[in-house]
Curated annotation (Swiss-Prot):
It is found in: Nucleus; Chromosome, Centromere, Kinetochore; Cytoplasm; Cytoplasm, Cytoskeleton, Spindle pole. It comes from Mus musculus (Mouse). The modification Phosphoserine is found at residues 130, 170, 185, 195. This is Mitotic spindle assembly checkpoint protein MAD2A. Residues 14-197 form the HORMA domain. The modification N-acetylalanine is found at residue 2. Component of the spindle-assembly checkpoint that prevents the onset of anaphase until all chromosomes are properly aligned at the metaphase plate. In the closed conformation (C-MAD2) forms a heterotetrameric complex with MAD1L1 at unattached kinetochores during prometaphase, and recruits an open conformation of MAD2L1 (O-MAD2) which then promotes the conversion of O-MAD2 to C-MAD2. It holds the Pfam family HORMA. Phosphorylated on multiple serine residues. The level of phosphorylation varies during the cell cycle and is highest during mitosis. Phosphorylation abolishes interaction with MAD1L1 and reduces interaction with CDC20. Phosphorylated by NEK2. Monomer and homodimer. Heterodimerizes with MAD2L1 in order to form a tetrameric MAD1L1-MAD2L1 core complex. In the closed and open conformation, interacts with MAD1L1. Formation of a heterotetrameric core complex containing two molecules each of MAD1L1 and of MAD2L1 promotes binding of another molecule of MAD2L1 to each MAD2L1, resulting in a heterohexamer. Interacts with MAD2L1BP. Interacts with ADAM17/TACE. Interacts with CDC20. Dimeric MAD2L1 in the closed conformation interacts with CDC20. Monomeric MAD2L1 in the open conformation does not interact with CDC20. GO terms for biological process: cell division; establishment of centrosome localization; establishment of mitotic spindle orientation; mitotic sister chromatid segregation; mitotic spindle assembly checkpoint signaling; negative regulation of mitotic cell cycle; negative regulation of mitotic metaphase/anaphase transition; negative regulation of protein catabolic process. Residues 195-205 are annotated as: Required for assuming the closed conformation and for interaction with CDC20. Belongs to the MAD2 family. The keyword Acetylation applies.
Length: 205
């Protein structure tokens, strides 16, 4: 029985990819809600990681995010994705106002068949909960977005990766005159995700 429990708690590369992709699904939803990119009434409450989180009910956005997360899961499994960035821009001017960057490290030795890492789901979820809580708390220091904004998702992958047709190449979309705040990280022992947010420094009149 003890051996079986240890096996169940072991993290595989596939399992790790699913955990990290799921985090991005909830994390992106949290950012879009907290920053008011979509109307608050288009979100619904769900329980995850011991928290009450908000996820979109917008059909087009659900379809888009599901496609991104499924593709991301495959790239995480191949250890070929380096970072995911949520870019928030002024719709009218195109100016980048915020850049949420998640750097992804992958232990490629986990690609070997049968490799499992010892870390409990609970320990991983506790770390993810801390990251999500920080995302929620950023509204206390991020400048108010007083203009209509849109968002883009950038995914940095290995150069030799075959990218689906619907995906476009993009520049890094950096911010001029910005402040950066490093957020917490979490690790499955196979994938490690480091988080930070950069935002345009408000100009004092």
């Amino acid at each position: 029985m003890a051996q079986q429990l240890a096996r169940e708690q072991g993290i595989t590369l596939r399992g790790s990819a699913e955990i990290v992709a799921e985090f991005f699904s909830f994390g992106i939803n949290s950012i879009l809600y907290q920053r008011g990119i979509y109307p608050s009434e288009t979100f619904t409450r769900v329980q995850k990681y011991g928290l009450t989180l908000l996820t979109t009910t917008d059909p087009e956005l659900i379809k888009y995010l599901n496609n991104v997360v499924e593709q991301l899961k495959e790239w995480l499994y191949k250890c070929s994705v380096q970072k995911l960035v949520v870019v928030i821009s002024n719709i009218e001017s195109g100016e980048v106002l915020e850049r949420w960057q998640f750097d992804i490290e992958c232990d490629k030795t986990a690609k070997e068949e049968g490799v499992r890492r010892e870390k409990s789901q609970k320990a991983i979820q506790d770390e993810i909960r801390s990251v999500i809580r920080q995302i929620t708390a950023t509204v206390t220091f991020l400048p108010l977005l007083e203009v209509s904004c849109s968002f883009d998702l950038l995914i940095y992958t290995d150069k030799d990766l075959v990218v689906p047709e619907k995906w476009e190449e993009s520049g890094p979309q950096f911010i001029t005159n910005c402040e950066e705040v490093r957020l917490r990280s979490f690790t499955t022992t196979i994938h490690k995700v480091n988080s930070m947010v950069a935002y345009k420094t408000p100009v004092n009149d």
